[in-house]
A protein has these predicted regions:
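Conserved, function-defining micro-sites of small-solute handling proteins
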Residues: 1-161
């Protein structure tokens, strides 16, 4: 999604950016912190520590509202764009895993997410911990795929062979 969000920002701002492909967020964050990369779209979980250390400046968030972990950072919507998007993390199992096993796994994940210890750690990264049912999570995945497909179509991105 970060590539799609960068392209959406490029279109909204009416600018042209040169994309640089990295093997994951880690190398990109290292390059921006070292001053060899001018701009990136990335997850708060890895950029907040650098923002707090004044090694990078987060100029906007795609979340619907400002987040407690970075109250000084405005949303892109506050800055006049229609860009609102937030990522999610989930626990997945192999296709064909029996439903009772999925339900047991989901129950334990929900308990972990609700724990004070987990919340105290994860909220420092800008993540708002929530849990969902198996079916709710399946709907989130489907909705995300639908939104990404619409963005790809809107931005005129063609499939590479």
């Amino acid at each position: 999604m970060t590539e799609l969000l960068a392209r959406q920002l490029e279109k909204t701002a009416g600018i042209t950016m040169t994309g640089v492909t990295f093997r994951g967020t880690g190398p990109a964050v290292q390059e921006i912190a070292a001053g060899r990369l001018d701009f990136m779209v990335g997850p708060l979980a890895v950029t907040i520590p650098l923002h707090e250390a004044k090694k990078v400046k987060i100029i906007g968030m795609t979340s619907p509202e400002r987040l407690p972990v970075a109250p000084d950072v405005p949303t892109l919507k506050e800055q006049g764009t229609d860009i609102v998007n937030y990522g999610w993390w989930g626990v997945c199992a192999a296709s064909g895993t029996p439903r009772p096993i999925l339900e047991t796994l989901n129950k334990h994940v929900a308990a972990a997410v609700a724990s004070a210890d987990f919340k105290s750690v994860i909220e420092k990264t800008g993540v708002i911990p929530v849990s969902s049912s198996i079916d709710e999570f399946a709907a989130i995945i489907a909705d995300t795929a639908k939104e990404a497909g619409a963005m790809i179509k809107e931005l005129g991105i063609e499939q590479l062979d």
